A protein has these predicted regions:
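NAD(P)-dependent short-chain dehydrogenase/reductase
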Residues: 4, 97-106, 128-199
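N-terminal Rossmann-like NAD(P)+-binding domain of SDR-like oxidoreductases, especially those catalyzing
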Residues: 1-149
Length: 200
């Protein structure tokens, strides 16, 4: 992973926490980590998760998000004591598709996938690999299709944090008699389901 630990610094010093650096794009790194720890469960949250960035860096997005998942699954397949595996999938896999049985309903497991970005394609590949390894190699693998989820640790490149950060900046600028640039957002017609990270 990247060396940025700012979002987990609150438990870095906890006596039961031991940070092991790894790289999902390097099978040897995954092998060393999993064989050192011998976990009961593995949660793959690794991804290059910015849709916009995925258009600028499709290879990086694929290598981390899709190939990284496959690398983890391959290491688990070769382990004697196989841990359970969870893949964090994304609602981006659906693209603009509706529920097959009722267009008024939200997307669910009956909705066709129609990815619209390199990120969504990579997530769909990881999702599909997890299903394949469950069926073909008898690995306990499952995926959760996550929609947008928010918390105080959400990066400031995401829309909710952009808006809340802008409101705070605007407040302080107004107090100090300063002007700040206008807030710039992307597609204002986009519809999303949001939840809190603790609910996931």
């Amino acid at each position: 992973s990247t060396p940025n630990t700012s979002r987990i610094k609150h438990f870095l010093t906890h006596k039961q926490f031991h940070l092991i650096q790894g790289d999902v794009t390097d099978s040897g790194s995954i092998y060393r980590c999993l064989n050192e720890v011998q976990p009961d469960e593995v949660y793959n949250l690794a991804a290059q998760s910015h849709v916009g960035t995925s258009f600028n860096q499709p290879n990086l997005t694929w290598n981390v998000t899709a190939q990284g998942c496959l690398n983890i699954l391959e290491v688990i397949r070769d382990m004697g004591n196989r841990p359970r595996f969870y893949q964090a999938s994304s609602s981006e896999m659906f693209g603009d598709q509706y529920n097959l049985y009722d267009k008024e309903k939200y997307q669910d497991e009956h909705t066709y996938f129609r990815p619209q970005s390199p990120y969504a394609i990579a997530k769909l590949a990881a999702h599909s690999a997890t299903m394949l390894y469950r069926r073909s190699y008898d690995i306990f693998g499952c995926s959760g299709i996550l929609f947008n989820h928010e918390s105080e640790r959400r990066g400031e490149r995401f829309v909710t944090r952009k808006v809340t950060r802008y409101v705070a900046d605007l407040y302080w600028a107004t107090q100090e008699g300063r002007m700040i640039p206008k807030l710039q957002l992307g597609n204002l017609n986009a519809k999303r389901d949001w939840g809190h990270a603790e609910d996931y």
